UniProtKB/Swiss-Prot annotation:
Function: Alcohol acetyltransferase that catalyzes the synthesis of ethyl acetate from ethanol and acetyl-CoA. Can also function as a thioesterase by hydrolyzing acetyl-CoA in the absence of ethanol, as well as esterase hydrolyzing ethyl acetate.
Source organism per UniProt: Kluyveromyces lactis (strain ATCC 8585 / CBS 2359 / DSM 70799 / NBRC 1267 / NRRL Y-1140 / WM37)
Span of chain positions assigned to the transit peptide in the UniProt entry: 1-21
Enzyme Commission identifier(s): 2.3.1.268, 3.1.2.1, 3.1.1.-
Catalytic activity line of the entry: ethanol + acetyl-CoA = ethyl acetate + CoA; acetyl-CoA + H2O = acetate + CoA + H(+); ethyl acetate + H2O = ethanol + acetate + H(+)
Annotated family: Belongs to the AB hydrolase superfamily.
Name by which UniProt lists this protein: Ethanol acetyltransferase 1
Ranges where the record places region Disordered: 344-368
Localization per record: Mitochondrion
Single Gene Ontology MF annotation: carboxylic ester hydrolase activity
Pfam families: Abhydrolase_1
Length: 368
């Protein structure tokens, strides 16, 4: 399953992507109107693989039956969390895959951009790399992808760590998401910052400041800026990186709609009778609106064997409290998950009833 003992192995599918999209959008296309994104039901997500720096089994080849997949949030990327995932790989003695979801980082730009499609990309990734059963860590958008994947494909997941999100529609976060993406579009339309400007980052930050006063949030967004077109790993078909201006790695103009409506949504009817019986750890940022007291009913309904760990932070908890969230993740996979499994196994009647209910539901679904 794992071919190397190197601590960090970058294996993005860049050559294939470049061949598929070797002709970026021209200036004329950009100026004449919004070039449509291609439609793809499944993409090969770009990824990095982080292996433990020290193995408890000495010089023997390291092997783990349960690798971890780390799914980032909206406007995030695998690069943002490479140091965190290296620490997790070593602390947990297991391989950690960090991926770029579609329209982010080094992965392809394509529609649809909704949770069902992102789950399909994740399932494809697991099968493509022959990972078997995995654990998932999901943050924000990635948290909802992880929850939905566990509910729809429980056979592929052992445990999940869900960071500051809940399995429910969240219309109250649409304003936040809209501001986040619109600030990027405003920077492109009004900032017109050149790539050869030595003060490009300062000027971009000042442009965003009107909409994003928090410096930490601005830095999170600025991590997506392309200021050197010669090192762009993925040449988007809808972005002209050769016009002398800075650009985002994301097709932000195309995400104005789906990046708000679909990201705040949740397929309630599709999963209303489903449960995931594996252990799930919810990390709740206490200064965030993504998990509120009303969310607990949905969490307990879908994930009966859960633990909720609170951290005093905003929704950007990974940036604000990196050591605290890492400790919470490590403690969950080392200790709490087994406590939740024991709790589940001590109530075999309830466990078997739930299993039979899920099995019958799946059988009915297949017959329709």
């Amino acid at each position: 399953m794992f071919l190397s003992l190197r601590p960090s192995l970058s294996v993005s599918r860049l050559a294939v992507v470049r061949r598929a999209y070797s002709s970026p959008a021209s200036k004329k296309q950009i100026n004449d109107g919004l070039v449509p994104l291609p439609h793809k039901e499944v993409i090969d997500m770009a990824f990095d693989l982080h292996l433990p720096e020290r193995s408890v089994i000495g010089k023997l080849p390291y092997h783990s039956p349960e690798p971890i997949i780390f799914f980032h949030g909206l406007l995030g990327s695998k690069r943002n969390y490479k140091h965190d995932c290296k620490k997790l790989a070593t602390a947990l003695q297991t391989p950690v895959y960090t991926v770029d979801v579609r329209n982010h980082g080094s992965s392809e730009h394509a529609l649809p951009f909704n949770y069902g499609t992102l789950v399909n990309d994740l399932v494809h990734f697991i099968h493509q790399h022959k990972l078997g059963k995995v654990n998932i860590i999901g943050y924000s958008l990635g948290a909802k992808v992880g929850m939905l994947a566990c509910l729809k494909h429980p056979e592929l997941f052992s445990a999940a760590c869900i960071i500051d999100n809940a399995p429910e529609p969240q219309p109250h976060i649409k304003a936040f998401l809209s501001t986040l993406i619109k600030s990027c579009v405003k920077l492109l339309d009004q900032g017109k910052v050149r790539v050869d400007d030595k003060l490009w980052r300062h000027k971009a930050s000042e442009s965003l400041k009107r909409y994003l006063p928090n410096a930490g949030v601005r830095n999170y967004v600025l991590n997506n800026i392309v200021h050197n077109p010669r090192v762009v790993e993925y040449r988007s078909p809808v972005i002209n990186y050769d016009d002398g201006l800075i650009h985002f790695k994301n097709p932000v103009r195309h995400m104005l709609d789906c990046g708000v409506k679909d990201v705040a949504d949740w397929p309630t009817e599709e999963v209303k009778d489903k449960k995931f019986l594996g252990p799930v750890n919810f990390i709740r940022a206490t200064k965030s609106a993504f998990i509120n007291p009303d969310s607990l009913k949905a969490i307990n309904s879908f994930f009966p064997f859960n633990n909720i760990h609170e951290i005093n932070a905003t929704h950007f908890v990974l940036n604000e409290r990196p050591q605290e969230y890492l400790r919470a993740v490590i403690d969950f996979f080392k200790v709490t998950r087994y406590q939740l499994e024991n709790k589940r196994n001590k109530d075999p009647n309830n466990y078997m009833q739930t299993q039979n209910s899920i099995s019958n539901s799946d059988t009915m679904g297949q017959s329709l």
